[in-house]
Amino acid sequence: MNTQSIGAKGKSKAAKGIAKRHRKQSSLSDSISKPAIRRIARRAGVRRVGGGCFKEINNAAREYIRDTLSIACIYATHAKRKTITCSDILHSLKRMGIKYIGY
């Protein structure tokens, strides 16, 4: 006997009770993933990344982004805008002492 009714889309009735597999949730939902950190490290020339480094890299990246965005927000509010533009980010990086060429 056919478990799937005629014209029905999706899975059969027999497969409805099967548990679905879920990805493991990380403790920091807004953190950078380990593979992403490895890719960035590879671009910088690093061959291996120690296990204890990931948390520190996440903290440093979060602080760097927070500082950059807070300065960019100051530029946007001074210009009476609610949207942060690319030039706001470039000015905030310049204020932090980082020269970014290409934009």
Curated annotation (Swiss-Prot):
Q: Region entry Disordered: which residue ranges? A: 1-32
N6-acetyl-N6-methyllysine is found on 16
- List UniProt keywords, sorted A-Z: Acetylation, Chromosome, DNA-binding, Methylation, Nucleosome core, Nucleus
Q: Which locations, inside or outside the cell, does it occupy?
A: Nucleus; Chromosome
Q: Mind telling me which InterPro entries this protein's record contains?
A: CBFA_NFYB_domain, Histone-fold, Histone_H4
DNA-binding annotation, residue ranges on this chain:
20-24
> Function, please?
Core component of nucleosome. Nucleosomes wrap and compact DNA into chromatin, limiting DNA accessibility to the cellular machineries which require DNA as a template. Histones thereby play a central role in transcription regulation, DNA repair, DNA replication and chromosomal stability. DNA accessibility is regulated via a complex set of post-translational modifications of histones, also called histone code, and nucleosome remodeling.
Name assigned to this protein: Histone H4
Q: Which organism is it from?
A: Encephalitozoon cuniculi (strain GB-M1) (Microsporidian parasite)
Its taxonomic path starts at: Eukaryota, Fungi, Fungi incertae sedis, Microsporidia, Unikaryonidae
Which gene is this protein's source?
HHF1
